[in-house]
Amino acid sequence: DNIVSSNALYGGTFTQFNDILPTLGIQVRFVDAEDPSNFAAAADENTRAFFCESCSNPALQICDLEVISKSAHDLGLPLIVDSTFSTPYLCRPFDHGADIVVSSLTKWVGGHGVCLGG
């Protein structure tokens, strides 16, 4: 199985996708999200999801969630969006076609790595 992901990711997410998921048999195909058509071009019959950050950390790349979600849905795939950096106040990915939205409470409770939240 594989997922197609933007290559503009928070470092911890990139490490998880690049180093940890392959040990579990999950391949991650990194694409340049500046061109949303790259997601569908990288997908195949073993692709299970598309992943991106609404606003990437630290590059500040903004993904076109509506176009990427349409590409995902045309292939019967979910779009997973990490919206930690933009916060739910500034961006609501569900309103733009995302199927799963994740956000790190740890970033907003303290921001210094002294607390932990999901």
Spans of model-derived segments:
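Conserved PLP-enzyme active-site core in the AAT-like
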Residues: 1-117
